[in-house]
Amino acid sequence: MSKRKYKTQNIFVVTLSLLSLLSMPINLNAAEFEFKFHHFLPSTSPAHITMIEPWVKKIEEESSGRVKIDIYPSMTLGGRPADLVSQARNGVVDLIWTSNGYTPGQFPRTELFELPLIHTNNPEKTGEVMHKMFSEYLAEDYSGLKVLFLHVHAGNVFQSVRKEITNINSFRGMKVRTPSRTGSWTLDELGSESISVPMPDVVQTLSKNIIDAALIPYEIIPTFKLNEYTKYQVEGYDGFRFGTLTFQLSMNRDKWDTLPDDIKRIFQANSDLSQWKKAGNIWQINDNDGLDYAMGNGNIHKILGYDETEEIKNRLKRTHDVWLKELSKENIDGVPILEKAIELMGE
């Protein structure tokens, strides 16, 4: 091959390569910081629509496009709800929203706020107290994670398939779905058999009569059409609930540590005390809507009497002792945490 022909071919190849590069779309607005956000509920759930999506959108907007957060609901990146914490800790995903109850014993200090008579059917107040106590009393639960905010739902009620609950004796012998080990402690004290079932599987266990009732808030009724599988929604006098669940929205710690300060400040500004309280308020509103939905579809809202509720409260105080014993097994003194929580919840 002559040098002239060889040179001509090279020029032709280089020209084609340049034209190919020039024809490729160039995204001048590509985000500098991209995040995978994984959680366990459907994109149609109130939590996704009213809490997660607005939070994500606000951070993206305040970063002027430098941050892009892709949300993956319903465990679409794989695994079970119980895997979310390890996925975040191991960097499989960047952000998670999950119930602490899916990983029993991993957040022992925080479990206090799930107990009956600590949470008093005011999720905004519970969020405020958790925020005040986080650095000194709760942070050790969250190694490998950067907690952005914690919250609780409005509180567990008994959603019964067919049995009408009238007093403390009604619970005895019932098979009840529990969302957490703290829920199991509650059911143990009431004489019920607890069956651990993640939220996405509750409908199946109800429809197959594996359980007689589910310990769950009203909020999620419309998403899973729980009114079609239950008849009674039962709570105590004056809004008394049978404990609650704690949730976390957290980031992989290594991911957090690599972020520049200005991006960190955007996340922090949207995860301050007002957000911890706001999350609780969102869940209270959604809970009210869920109850209205059930009643509007023919379900029966049962409120136990004052005397019956007081008897239940006295029984469920024992769950505090169970929690203290569990912490002592981990060489954690739970008494100061319990005393501080009671003090702040009473303010």
Tell where the protein language model's regions lie, with residue ranges.
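Bacterial N-terminal signal peptides
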Residues: 13-24
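Sec/Tat signal peptide C-region and signal peptidase I cleavage site
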Residues: 24-30
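N-terminal secretory/targeting leader peptides
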Residues: 31-122, 140-347
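A gly/proline- and charged-residue-enriched helix-loop-helix capping module
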Residues: 120-137
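A subset of signal/propeptide-processing and intrinsically disordered low-complexity segments
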Residues: 4-5, 22, 60
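Bacterial N-terminal signal peptides that target proteins for export
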Residues: 2-15
